[in-house]
Regions:
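Bacterial N-terminal signal peptides that target proteins for export
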Residues: 1-8
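Bacterial N-terminal signal peptides
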Residues: 9-17
């Protein structure tokens, strides 16, 4: 293997973790602030503990899997999280499980909802994810 090949291979190996790492550090405070200000359409990254699994229900366009998430820091808010199973597949969460989510927060008085927790195939919306059990659902 030539020196050029070794340098290229080293560069490629060093680049893979950065390219594969799509998660962002959670900022539960952003969710708490959006809730307090009654704001919607706020892109958030949050983490917490699943307090209730709502299961899969038919949505307006496609089925969604829902669960309630108690935020880990910032405030003790419980938000509903919805995942479009056409994109993420079934996640299969359990109560007490730690989860991180990225999506769009929508206010409502009982805590709000985080949706768009998946990629947008049309590219019109920022993609989201759910990270659970060491696996990333997009």
């Amino acid at each position: 293997m030539s020196r050029t090949d070794r340098v290229f291979l080293a560069f490629l190996i060093a680049s893979v973790p950065a390219a594969c790492s799509t998660t962002q550090p959670p900022n539960d405070r952003a969710v708490c602030e959006a809730y307090s200000a009654e704001r919607s359409r706020v892109e958030v990254v949050a983490d917490g503990t699943v307090t209730r699994v709502l299961g899969v229900a038919p949505g307006r366009v496609s089925p969604h899997e829902g669960f309630l998430l108690r935020l880990e820091s910032g405030c003790s808010l419980v938000v509903r999280v919805e995942a479009n199973t056409d994109f993420t597949g079934r996640i299969g969460l359990s109560e007490g499980q730690r989860v991180a989510v990225k999506g769009e927060y929508e206010y409502y008085p009982r805590g709000g909802v985080v949706h768009w927790t998946h990629r947008d195939p049309r590219g019109r919306h920022e993609g989201g994810y759910i990270e659970a059990g060491g696996r990333l659902y997009e």
